[in-house]
């Protein structure tokens, strides 16, 4: 069963599935992101010489900096290895950027141990089947509006925005609100 809630200044609603939350009142301390399909729109541009290009949303980048400034650890775990992903992660100050990991449970668990976090203290966002272990393990999970059916089923929240089009920012704002770092605002009719 889905319920609707409103978060943020936009007053936009999100579809939240009822599922008992493993958070047990803990604050979220770390954010785990898939890259392709979450931080990008999932498309990869390849020039004639083989150079790869990706497009990252600047609003998502600002949200990432905001999360880091609020004291959250930020990790990107990607199935692909890309210099563009490395450069963007470095530019934003992402704490961990792990690439070439098609199986994401092991790096997720490794970072939880390194950062001394319970899974209930983490939030994860992903858009496809390789992301399911993170979505299922995290205390809070979400997926972009254009995620695959499997990711939509596994996530606690299906966001309004698509991957590479503000989904990461929407997710970050939601986590900050859950942590009490942002006030929840409802738009007046």
Model-identified regions with their sequence ranges:
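Alpha-helical substrate-recognition element adjacent to the catalytic core
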Residues: 3-7, 15-106, 189
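Mg2+-dependent phosphoryl-transfer enzymes with acidic/Ser/Thr/Gly-rich catalytic loops
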Residues: 46, 50-57, 90-92, 96-98, ...
């Amino acid at each position: 069963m889905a319920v609707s809630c409103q978060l943020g200044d936009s007053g936009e609603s999100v579809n939240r599935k009822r599922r008992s939350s493993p958070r047990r009142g803990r604050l979220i301390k770390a954010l785990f992101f898939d890259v392709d399909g979450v931080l990008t729109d999932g498309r990869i541009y390849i020039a004639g010489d083989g150079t790869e290009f990706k497009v990252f949303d600047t609003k998502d980048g600002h949200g990432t900096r905001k999360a880091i400034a609020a004291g959250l650890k930020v990790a990107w775990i990607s199935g692909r290895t890309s210099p563009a992903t490395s450069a963007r992660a470095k530019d934003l100050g992402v704490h961990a950027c792990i690439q070439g990991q098609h199986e994401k449970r092991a790096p997720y668990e490794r970072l939880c141990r390194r950062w001394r976090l319970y899974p209930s203290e983490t939030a994860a966002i992903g858009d496809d089947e390789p992301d399911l272990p993170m979505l299922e393990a995290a205390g809070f999970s979400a997926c972009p509006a254009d995620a695959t059916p499997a990711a939509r089923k596994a996530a606690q929240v299906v966001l309004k925005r698509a991957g590479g089009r503000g989904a990461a920012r929407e997710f970050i704002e939601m986590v900050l609100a859950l942590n009490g770092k942002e006030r929840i605002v409802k738009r007046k009719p």
